[in-house]
Structure formats: C-alpha cells, structure tokens
Amino acid sequence: MLGRTLREVSVELKQGQITPTELCQRCLSLIKKTKFLNAYITVSEEVALKQAEESEKRYKKGHSLGDLDGIPIAVKDNFSTSGIETTCASNMLKGYVPPYNATVVQKLLDQGALLMGKTNLDEFAMGSGSTDGIFGPVKNPWSYSKQYREKRKQNSHSENEDSNWLITGGSSGGSAAAVSAFTCFAALGSDTGGSTRNPAAHCGVVGLKPSYGLVSRHGLIPLVNSMDVPGILTRCVDDAATVLGVLAGHDPKDSTTIQDPVKPFTLPSLTDVSKLCIGIPKEYLTPELSSEVQSLWSKAANLFESEGAKVTEVSLPHTSYSIVCYHVLCTSEVASNMARFDGLEYGHRCDSDVSTEAMYAATRREGFNDVVRGRILSGNFFLLKENYENYFVKAQKVRRLIANDFVNVFNSGVDVLLTPTTLSEAVPYTEFIKEDNRTRSAQDDIFTQAVNMAGLPAVSVPVALSSQGLPIGLQFIGRAFCDQQLLIVAKWFEKQVQFPVIQLQELMDDCSSVFENEKLASVSLK
C-alpha cells in the first residue's frame, strides 16, 4: 500500500479499500522503523492522527475534499507550521513555534492532507548534502537497498559496512528520503539553486521546481528571495502535477505570485513526441560529468530522436559565469535575510547583558553554524559600498544575460531542454565531507542554479541505476509558466524508462508487507 503512488492510494481511499487512519498509522510505523535515516526532525503523530480522523469522517459522508484528502505528506523544516516547531535545522530557531502556516502548507491542509512531520535539511537550506544541520546528516535510503548492497557484495565490500552510507543530496534531503523510503506520498522541499532536484536525483524520486511566481513563498523562511521556490518531491510525475495543481496560484501575501487563477490539472498521456524539439545545451558537457551520467544523457536524447522528436544541440553561452554569479547574488541576499535573526523578536537569544551589540554578536555566533556565518560574511563583503558596483551590480547584469540565453533558446523553437541533474550518483558521506560546504555546493549546483536565476520550471526524473545500483536522474527545463507542458514531456519520458522501485526488504524484513506488491521494472536506457 505505501509503495503505491499518491493518485493510486487516493482512489483506494475513495473506494474504501483503506481508511485515512489506517494509512496514517502505517506511515507512522514506517517512520519509526526508518528513524535511523534521520529524515524527520519532528514527527507530528498526534496532529496527523487527528487529521486522519477528520478525513475519515468526510469519506464516510461522501464529502471528500479531493485527491489529497487523507494522503500523508511531509514538509521541509524551513516552512512555517502553526503550532509545530520550525527550526531550519539551526540553533537559531530551535524551539521556535510559528503562529501561522506557510501558504503552501495551508493549501495542502485545506485539501485534507495529513502532516506526518517536518523533514531534515542543511542549516537554513545552505548546502547540497543535507549534512550540515544541527540534527545530524540524512542517510540515503538507497544505502540500504537490495540493489546497492548486492553491487557492493560483487565488489567485495562488506554488506554490513554502515560507514559507507550515502548522502541524500540537499538541501531538501529529508524530504527526498521521506518519499523514497515510503514514509509519505509527497513532500515539500525548497529550491534556491537545486535543493529539490539534487536530492531527488540522488534518492530516485521526482523533484519539481516550479516557475518562480507560480507558487507562494509566504511562510518559507527566506534564503534568497529572488530565487527561492517551494519544491515538490513525489514518486512519479503525475503525483507532482497533482500537488502543483493544489499549490499554484495567486497569494495576496506574496506579491511575486501570478495574478491569474490556476486550476488543478491532470496530465494527459503524450503518445506522439514527433512535434517536440528537445535542446541539449553543449556547455553542460563538463569534464567533471561522470561517464555513466553522460551515457544516460546521450541515450535519453537518442530515445526522443528514435520516437520522432527533433533533438538539437543548443548554446547557453554565459553558463561558465553562472555559478560565480549565483554565489555573489546568493550570499548577498543571505546576508540581508539573516540580519533579522538578532535575538530580539524570536529565536535564540544570548544571555549577554554587556551591551546590545555584544548580545547581537553572541546570539549570532551561538545561533549560526560556520557555513551560515561564512555566507553572511561573503555577502556583506559584496554589499560594501566600495564593492557593490563591482560585484553585486555586475552579477545582476550577468544574471540577466543568463536568463536571456534561455529566452533565446526557447525562441529558436526548442520546447524543452534535457540536461543532467547532478555530476554523478550519490557518494558516501565519508567522501562527501572531505570538501567544505562551499566547494561541494559549487560542484553540485552546476546544472541546476541557472534555472533559478532565470525563474524557469525544471524537473528531475529518475532514469536508471548506475553500475553501483544507485539512482541517476536527468533534468528537464521548460519555458517560464509552461510547467504543465514540461510535466507532460517528463511523464512520457518516465513511462519509457520505467525506473525500478527501491527494494528495502532486507532492511525491514518485518515490514515486508509494505513492499510485497512492488515489482522490479526493467530499465530501458541501460
């Protein structure tokens, strides 16, 4: 049951094959069994069971609120949740309980979704591994999959060697792990430079970054206001579309959202791709790209071509400047946004009574980790009067050039861009932490951050397993506010590749009934 898609289990709820309470209890049981993954910071068991009880009453009366009624979901812990602690995985906000819900959270609850809990992340969403929060790193469920462990056996590695568990990617690693491990059917992440798509690729799930302005940011604790977007993590493209249909639309509390109303939609099944033009950005073929990802990228392009689509190489000439441009703009906005955490209104406050200035300094020293403090320092440097024109203003100009590159490509007749999501599959934690956060983020955001600067929709779709038995994802990028068209193409591709279901039986042999109906599908691109 828990291995099914959101839409499938929604049908079973409506038919009475399972009740919301039974579904909720199964998810809660699995959350407890997979606690070692560290996917959740807070498990809202009482809240979820109460919501399930209310959902059950509606179903009995025949008054279902829609496809999300009674569906267990999880929310990244940088979205405000009324009455539930919201920490951003930081000492600065540990113990902070917001008095309101983020708009996206409220929209899900209004549709009857069950909030299972708040998921783990890098502190204030600054990172690409979900390793730097105060609650510890998130473990990738695929570390314990039958597929990965069998490959390790073949390579003479110890099957029980837990020191080589894999990172989830970040910063929405908790949400990706929660969906991948079947503890919920959908989860909210945030995406500033790839923080939803990166962990989606590493955890073998779908990660959608909507167009900037399509989904409200109200209640998302800001990192970079001009790039932050609530992200969606699900096990299939159809489910991502279902959640997007609920979340999208104008919000008077977020002036950047679109004015036009957005209706929920169901993705049609595309049968003919011959009229599509798929663009392959030549600048994304970098020396650091693993041979396996490169091979799958090429095979995916060939798949479209073999079905009649036009596949053409395109140029995004300012790509080489994008990661530096992103760093300048990101840290500058971080410095501005983090200024609100001064110990006066909410969050952590140091006991220092020497002076107000001393209290500010001590509060921020105790509340923020080295990564956050480092980004604040970088941002303040770029915003200094003597540096403002040479760094911040120039970066804004380069950002416009990067956005124009995408506009020019789409105006040339390209419908969708096809790129890698990450340079390689997930790496072991011990290998990941050999490099500092900033270096890792610069490497891991290489294919994803330009989309945020351009405000475009993008989705990472799992494609196949690597030779190590680990997921690899590819990214589709669409025109601004053409999210539905993007998802239609992604759905067609998903159907062709038939990504295999994660096999966790060996890990949870006492929970085999959860997975007994799942079949290992063949992978057509391997």
From Swiss-Prot:
Its main location: mitochondrion. Gene3D superfamilies: Amidase signature (AS) domain (3.90.1300.10). Transmembrane segments: none annotated. Pfam families: Amidase. InterPro entries: Amidase, Amidase_dom, AS_sf, GatA. GO terms for cellular component: glutamyl-tRNA(Gln) amidotransferase complex; mitochondrion. It catalyses: L-glutamyl-tRNA(Gln) + L-glutamine + ATP + H2O = L-glutaminyl-tRNA(Gln) + L-glutamate + ADP + phosphate + H(+). Residues 147-166 are annotated as: Disordered. Its EC number is 6.3.5.7. It comes from the Eukaryota. SUPFAM superfamilies: Amidase signature (AS) enzymes. Keywords: ATP-binding, Ligase, Mitochondrion, Nucleotide-binding, Protein biosynthesis. PANTHER family: GLUTAMYL-TRNA(GLN) AMIDOTRANSFERASE SUBUNIT A, MITOCHONDRIAL, TRANSAMIDASE. Belongs to the amidase family. GatA subfamily. Subunit of the heterotrimeric GatCAB amidotransferase (AdT) complex, composed of A (QRSL1), B (GATB) and C (GATC) subunits. NCBIfam families: gatA (TIGR00132). This is Glutamyl-tRNA(Gln) amidotransferase subunit A, mitochondrial. It comes from Bos taurus.
